[in-house]
Amino acid sequence: RNTLLPLPAGKSTWDLGRATSNDLEVSDITISSVHARVHLQSNTWYVEDLNSTNGTRINGEKIDRGVLTDGDTLRLGKVDLLFKSLSPGETF
């Protein structure tokens, strides 16, 4: 079962983590309070690990910073998230 965790519209940078102050809150003990940042720049999606305890991975590869493409698996701690880049009007 997939759970859709949409990034709030109207921004180009989103913080992900366990704390409620994040743009996307993911409640799991293996995720740091402020774990990673997703950023959209010139139609390219980037993710940056923010010195998290358990790391950030794209398709199994540990990264400090990397490019996200449609269908990638983004792992924060032990939580896998499917990255889906939607066009306006497209649904998951």
Q: Which residues fall in each region the model found?
A:
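C-terminal boundary/linker segments immediately following FHA domains
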Residues: 46, 53, 57-92
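Buried hydrophobic-core signal for structured, non-transmembrane domains
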Residues: 36-38
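Loop/turn elements at beta-strand to alpha-helix junctions within RNA-recognition modules
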Residues: 29-32, 52
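Structural recognition of beta-strand segments within beta-rich domains
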Residues: 15-18, 40, 46
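A generic beta-sheet turn/junction motif
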Residues: 9, 40-42, 51
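Thr-Gly-centered strand-to-loop micro-motif
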Residues: 26-27, 34, 58-59
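N-terminal beta-hairpin/loop module of FHA
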Residues: 1-30, 89
